[in-house]
Structures are given as C-alpha cells and as structure tokens.
C-alpha cells in the first residue's frame, strides 16, 4: 500500500502488510536477533546493529536528533520473504533546523511475521547536513560501529 504515513512504524506496516504479525509495540515488529545494516553510513555512525536491544539503543540516541513531518511510501516490490520498498520522509535536524528530506531504499527479510534483517540505503550527505556536519553528527550519534 503506497501513500503517506505519520510514523515510520505505520510506513513499515503499510509496506509489509499481512507479512507482519500484529503487534502492540514498534520494536516487536523486529525479531529478537534482527540484523540492521546501513551500507552508506558515514564515519562515526553504526554500519550494523545486531539484536533488538541494539536497535532500541540506536533509536533512543537518534530519535531526539531528527524531527519527522511525514513519510511517503513510493513503491513496494515483494518477493517471497524479502520485500524491497522505496520511501521518503520530510523533516529536519532538531538542533539545526536544517532540512532532512531523505529518500530510502529498504531491503527487508521477514521470518515468522517479524523483520529479521533490514538493509537501509540512504544518502548520508542529507543526514550530515541536517545534523550539523560530520563532526557534530558523529558526536551526537555516539560513533559506535556495532552494537550487540
């Protein structure tokens, strides 16, 4: 289902549909041992997260840094347990006010109704600009490459 969404969780539910088990909490969308990869992450940002707890810690650090107005699901390409989808978001850096208008390609693998692997492709230059540059962004993010 393409269209606009208020939250990233709603966008995931729209993109993955009935492949996802119904859940109450956003983090329950992800398997306990989820692998989250950011192939284009800039220096100082994690390139890989291992496990739901690591994802939760990452989101706790990242959440206050960016403000989102909306998410728009553009296209969805399902293929068995893997779904590729393209989406965009409109927002800004919380401290800088700089635009965070990002486009993503996500490759998601599901297992037993949960996200087991998520590869997130996005433009790091847009993120760095929104956060105030490389040094500021790395300091804000914490700079840990792998959490587990």
Residue ranges of predicted features:
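A beta-strand edge to alpha-helix "cap/lid" segment located at domain peripheries
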Residues: 1, 60-148
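Short acidic-aromatic low-complexity motifs
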Residues: 1-33, 146-148
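Serine/threonine-rich low-complexity intrinsically disordered regions
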Residues: 3, 7, 19-25, 50, ...
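Generic alpha-helical hydrophobic packing signal
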Residues: 4-15, 34, 52-56, 84, ...
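A solvent-exposed, acidic/Ser-Thr-rich amphipathic alpha-helical stretch
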Residues: 5, 23-80
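Residue-level detector of alpha-helix boundaries and kinks
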Residues: 10-11, 19, 40-43, 93
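Short, flexible active-site loop motifs that bind/organize anionic cofactors or intermediates
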Residues: 16, 45, 117
